[in-house]
Regions:
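Hydrophobic, aromatic-rich membrane-embedded alpha-helical segments
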Residues: 15, 90, 94, 138-159, ...
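Membrane-embedded or membrane-proximal helical elements that form or frame transporter/channel pores
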Residues: 66-92, 251-259
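Juxtamembrane transition segments at transmembrane-helix termini in multipass membrane proteins
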Residues: 2-3, 14, 51, 55-62, ...
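Hydrophobic alpha-helical transmembrane segments of multi-pass membrane proteins
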Residues: 83-91, 147-151, 259-271
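Alpha-helical membrane-spanning segments of integral membrane proteins, especially the hydrophobic core
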Residues: 72-77, 81-82, 114, 118-142
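N-terminal juxtamembrane cytosolic/stromal segments of multi-pass membrane proteins
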Residues: 1-28, 114-121, 322
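Membrane-interface helix starts
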Residues: 16-35, 127-131, 187-195
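Hydrophobic alpha-helical transmembrane segments of multi-pass membrane transport/permease proteins
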Residues: 25-51, 88-91, 136-140, 195-211
């Protein structure tokens, strides 16, 4: 059966359906990459908190700690376990973005996802170019921080949105070629790509986090979690913001804001598979369109126009005939007269 072109809205709704129909598997797959980052940072903060609280008594007990270099070294050492967990989880999160792309064929055929380890291994085997691609992405993100480049980088972000899909489905391309390929695919489809980016951005970065945060507030979960981190918040230095014309911010507000930020970040990361599915489907759609356009152009080049056919027939008929020598002789005699 011939494949029908899908509209951006059709792809958006299908991506949502595929994500939520495999929600339990995606939650399980993303749990360590997402919660591992939170656990790693939490461990760093927790150990640092107890370290600073007990530092005076430790210095009294162990005179060797009464040295600046020793304190710095010890401060670094106590954060290493948490940092190790965070880095491992963060790397797995980056790999998951590429791995979920390669699961698309199975999802479209059966509606299910499976064999996560095999798809993850496909990306890890290409870790060097994968890191190179993320390095380019990091440079672009740093440039985008500058307000002078917001408009330009915002436009380029639309054109470069498919770089990781290109990396997954066209493994022969280098990171720089992936960027160029994404730009070529989106070219001519900017409005549709921007619409998809806006839709999935609003859903996964705004609506879902805000709905869950609202439910947490109503259930008192935000207050409960805020109270748990109050001992750490209380260690923050007091700053008189009123002298700068800024209203005073209470410690409770800081704790609530911290919890809401963490909850929103967790939900945004858990919806990574939805974004990955959507952009993989959009890549396939644009890639198929580009292939058909190239095929049509090639056929047109092979099909000769009527004038070209007429010229070719004329050349075949007269091109190889020799000019009569008598004609040349008569022409030269006329020139002499």
């Amino acid at each position: 059966m011939a494949r029908q072109n899908k509209t951006p809205l059709g792809i958006f709704s299908e991506a949502i359906g595929l994500y939520f129909s495999n929600f339990d598997k995606f939650i399980q797959y993303m749990s360590f990459p997402v919660l591992g980052q939170i656990a790693g940072l939490g461990l760093v903060l927790l150990i640092t908190f107890f370290y600073t609280q007990n530092l005076p008594s430790l210095i009294e007990k162990y005179s060797a700690l009464n040295d600046f270099n020793t304190l710095i070294l010890l401060s670094i050492l106590i954060t290493l376990p948490g940092l190790a967990i965070f880095i491992k989880a963060f790397w797995d999160y980056l790999v998951a973005y590429g791995a979920i792309n390669s699961m698309l064929d199975n999802m479209l055929k059966s509606g299910r996802v499976y064999d996560f380890d095999a798809h993850t291994e496909l990306i890890k085997r290409r870790s060097v170019p994968f890191v190179g691609l993320w390095f380019l992405f990091g440079i672009f993100s740093l440039i985008a921080v500058c307000p002078l480049f917001w408009v330009v980088c915002g436009i380029l972000a639309v054109y470069f949105v498919l770089v990781f899909q290109v990396f997954t489905f066209e493994p022969e391309l280098s990171p720089a070629q992936c960027v160029k390929r994404s730009l070529d695919l989106v070219k001519g489809h900017f409005a549709s790509t921007f619409m998809l980016m806006a839709l999935v951005g609003l859903l996964t970065y705004l609506f879902i986090p805000q709905i869950v945060i609202k439910l947490f507030d109503m259930a008192g979960i935000s207050t409960f979690l805020g109270n748990l981190i109050m001992p750490i918040v209380n260690q923050l230095p007091e700053i008189n913001l009123t002298m700068y014309g800024i209203p005073e911010i209470s410690k409770d507000s800081i704790a609530q804001f911290t919890i809401q930020t963490f909850v929103a970040q967790i939900l945004i990361q858990y919806t990574l598979p939805l974004r990955s599915i959507l952009w993989s489907m959009w890549y396939r759609e644009l890639s198929n369109k580009a292939y058909k356009l190239k095929e049509t152009t090639t056929k047109k080049r092979k099909t000769k126009r009527p004038s070209e056919k007429l010229m070719e027939a004329s050349h075949k008929k007269y091109g190889k005939k020799k000019i009569d020598t008598n004609i040349l002789k008569r022409a030269s005699e006329k020139d002499e007269d």
